């Protein structure tokens, strides 16, 4: 008798995706982040669903409903802080996942990579809209500043912003639609994740050497399921420590004040995971230029497969490219720090230099270094 796991139409899909899936025998812990992201997404949808049961998307009651969740709902505070800090874990895993892809040349699986970049945009949009929902000071002013950037688009900008706002300022209509989209988008993201995996399973996983591993594959279960569970336990531990010991570490104190359109906070800044992009936006004095740089800072990932000039896929055996990669990481950390600082000397010039370096490394220095390494191989 055939095993039901291999014969049942639905079980067969699960089996071929998570159990009998052939995986390279040498993939390291950097390959754990895909499964961690899946668990982060499930956690966010689950906690978000329970929060939505108690939340009201009305300007008059939104702030109070969040307070009510924290004070009156059974374990509502756990739900809220799991959701808020779960987003931070989500972005940590996302950035490490993308970094892994850049380091090991996984971007050469163009379809998987491009869906991944679209996913990154979708997750960032969802997180931004979620940050608006508690309707605190930073929520309101963050929404105002970021949506206002669209007014830089020539000709249609102003109309577009008012259309998104549903009026002449960020108000009740804006909050309601942001809640609707914040609820809807994670399900769209889930569907896109399936497409992401579909494309990945067409080619199979890359590995640290960047050499095809077709002749040396092992089943995903039990080897990588056990390995993923270890990563999961470490992530859950970190998340729970954050939630129970320092739940407001990543938040902004201003967001504990109800939104007031008549009082602008002294420094408007987004959550930490958007600070690098915010720093790039602020480093350009021109409004449209800043918006373009902001979008391009993420969109540049789309063209990385076309910028790959090396004869080797992975950076494992390319020391010069490795130096550039870690310079890029240091540059992104610098941008993240600058994004949280006030707009004054010396932060402005540091931000501008870091922004120039960011685009230079990806678009100019990486391809040139790879080209040089190809010639060094001949010596």
Curated annotation (Swiss-Prot):
<keyword id="KW-0812">Transmembrane</keyword>
<feature type="binding site" description="axial binding residue">
    <location>
        <position position="196"/>
    </location>
    <ligand>
        <name>heme b b566</name>
    </ligand>
</feature>
<feature type="transmembrane region" description="Helical">
    <location>
        <begin position="226"/>
        <end position="246"/>
    </location>
</feature>
<dbReference type="GO" id="GO:0046872">
    <property type="term" value="F:metal ion binding"/>
</dbReference>
<dbReference type="Pfam" id="PF00032">
    <property type="entry name" value="Cytochrom_B_C"/>
</dbReference>
<feature type="transmembrane region" description="Helical">
    <location>
        <begin position="347"/>
        <end position="367"/>
    </location>
</feature>
<feature type="transmembrane region" description="Helical">
    <location>
        <begin position="320"/>
        <end position="340"/>
    </location>
</feature>
<dbReference type="InterPro" id="IPR005798">
    <property type="entry name" value="Cyt_b/b6_C"/>
</dbReference>
<feature type="binding site" description="axial binding residue">
    <location>
        <position position="182"/>
    </location>
    <ligand>
        <name>heme b b562</name>
    </ligand>
</feature>
<protein>
    <recommendedName>
        <fullName>Cytochrome b</fullName>
    </recommendedName>
</protein>
<keyword id="KW-0472">Membrane</keyword>
<feature type="transmembrane region" description="Helical">
    <location>
        <begin position="33"/>
        <end position="53"/>
    </location>
</feature>
<feature type="transmembrane region" description="Helical">
    <location>
        <begin position="113"/>
        <end position="133"/>
    </location>
</feature>
<keyword id="KW-0249">Electron transport</keyword>
<dbReference type="InterPro" id="IPR005797">
    <property type="entry name" value="Cyt_b/b6_N"/>
</dbReference>
<comment type="subunit">
    <text>The cytochrome bc1 complex contains 11 subunits: 3 respiratory subunits (MT-CYB, CYC1 and UQCRFS1), 2 core proteins (UQCRC1 and UQCRC2) and 6 low-molecular weight proteins (UQCRH/QCR6, UQCRB/QCR7, UQCRQ/QCR8, UQCR10/QCR9, UQCR11/QCR10 and a cleavage product of UQCRFS1). This cytochrome bc1 complex then forms a dimer.</text>
</comment>
<dbReference type="InterPro" id="IPR036150">
    <property type="entry name" value="Cyt_b/b6_C_sf"/>
</dbReference>
<dbReference type="InterPro" id="IPR016174">
    <property type="entry name" value="Di-haem_cyt_TM"/>
</dbReference>
<keyword id="KW-0349">Heme</keyword>
<keyword id="KW-0408">Iron</keyword>
<feature type="transmembrane region" description="Helical">
    <location>
        <begin position="77"/>
        <end position="98"/>
    </location>
</feature>
<feature type="binding site" description="axial binding residue">
    <location>
        <position position="83"/>
    </location>
    <ligand>
        <name>heme b b562</name>
    </ligand>
</feature>
<keyword id="KW-0479">Metal-binding</keyword>
<comment type="similarity">
    <text>Belongs to the cytochrome b family.</text>
</comment>
<keyword id="KW-0496">Mitochondrion</keyword>
<keyword id="KW-0679">Respiratory chain</keyword>
<feature type="binding site" description="axial binding residue">
    <location>
        <position position="97"/>
    </location>
    <ligand>
        <name>heme b b566</name>
    </ligand>
</feature>
<dbReference type="GO" id="GO:0008121">
    <property type="term" value="F:ubiquinol-cytochrome-c reductase activity"/>
</dbReference>
<keyword id="KW-0830">Ubiquinone</keyword>
<feature type="transmembrane region" description="Helical">
    <location>
        <begin position="288"/>
        <end position="308"/>
    </location>
</feature>
<dbReference type="GO" id="GO:0045275">
    <property type="term" value="C:respiratory chain complex III"/>
</dbReference>
<keyword id="KW-0813">Transport</keyword>
<keyword id="KW-0999">Mitochondrion inner membrane</keyword>
<feature type="transmembrane region" description="Helical">
    <location>
        <begin position="178"/>
        <end position="198"/>
    </location>
</feature>
<comment type="function">
    <text>Component of the ubiquinol-cytochrome c reductase complex (complex III or cytochrome b-c1 complex) that is part of the mitochondrial respiratory chain. The b-c1 complex mediates electron transfer from ubiquinol to cytochrome c. Contributes to the generation of a proton gradient across the mitochondrial membrane that is then used for ATP synthesis.</text>
</comment>
<dbReference type="InterPro" id="IPR027387">
    <property type="entry name" value="Cytb/b6-like_sf"/>
</dbReference>
<keyword id="KW-1133">Transmembrane helix</keyword>
<dbReference type="InterPro" id="IPR030689">
    <property type="entry name" value="Cytochrome_b"/>
</dbReference>
<dbReference type="GO" id="GO:0006122">
    <property type="term" value="P:mitochondrial electron transport, ubiquinol to cytochrome c"/>
</dbReference>
<dbReference type="InterPro" id="IPR048259">
    <property type="entry name" value="Cytochrome_b_N_euk/bac"/>
</dbReference>
<dbReference type="InterPro" id="IPR048260">
    <property type="entry name" value="Cytochrome_b_C_euk/bac"/>
</dbReference>
<dbReference type="GO" id="GO:0005743">
    <property type="term" value="C:mitochondrial inner membrane"/>
</dbReference>
């Amino acid at each position: 008798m055939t095993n039901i796991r291999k014969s049942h139409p639905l079980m067969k899909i699960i089996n071929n995706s998570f159990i009998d899936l052939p995986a390279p025998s040498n993939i390291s812990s950097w390959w754990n982040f895909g499964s961690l992201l899946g668990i982060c997404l499930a956690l966010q949808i689950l906690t978000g669903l329970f929060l939505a049961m108690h939340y009201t998307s009305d300007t008059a009651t939104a702030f109070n409903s969040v307070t009510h969740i924290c004070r009156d709902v059974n374990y509502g505070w756990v739900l809220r802080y799991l959701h808020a800090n779960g987003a931070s874990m989500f972005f940590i895993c996302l950035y490490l996942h993308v970094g892994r892809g850049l380091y090991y040349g996984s971007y050469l699986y163009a379809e998987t990579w491009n869906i991944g970049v679209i996913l990154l945009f979708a997750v960032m949009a969802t997180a931004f809209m979620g940050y608006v929902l508690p309707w605190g000071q930073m929520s309101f002013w963050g929404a105002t500043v970021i949506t206002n950037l669209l007014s830089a688009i020539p000709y249609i900008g102003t109309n577009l912003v008012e259309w998104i706002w549903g009026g002449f300022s960020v108000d009740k209509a804006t909050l309601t639609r942001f809640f609707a989209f914040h609820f809807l988008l994670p399900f769209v993201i889930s569907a896109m994740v399936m497409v992401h995996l579909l494309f990945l399973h067409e080619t199979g996983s890359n590995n640290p050497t960047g050499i095809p591993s077709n002749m040396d594959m092992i089943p995903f279960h039990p080897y990588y399921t056990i390995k993923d569970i270890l990563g999961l336990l470490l992530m859950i531990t970190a998340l729970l420590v954050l939630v129970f010991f320092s739940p407001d570490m990543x938040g902004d104190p201003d967001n504990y004040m109800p939104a007031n359109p008549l009082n602008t906070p002294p420094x408007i800044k987004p959550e930490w995971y958007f600070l690098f992009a915010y720093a790039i936006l602020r480093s350009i004095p021109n409004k449209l230029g800043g918006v373009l740089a902001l979008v391009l800072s993420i969109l540049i990932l789309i063209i990385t497969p076309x910028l790959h000039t090396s004869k080797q896929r992975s950076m494992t055996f390319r020391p010069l490219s490795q130096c550039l990669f870690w310079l890029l990481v240091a540059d992104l950390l610098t941008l993240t720090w600058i994004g949280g600082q006030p707009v004054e000397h010396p932060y402005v010039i540091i931000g501008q230099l870091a922004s120039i370096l960011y685009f230079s490394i990806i678009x100019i220095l990486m391809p040139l270094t790879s080209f040089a390494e190809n010639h060094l191989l001949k010596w």
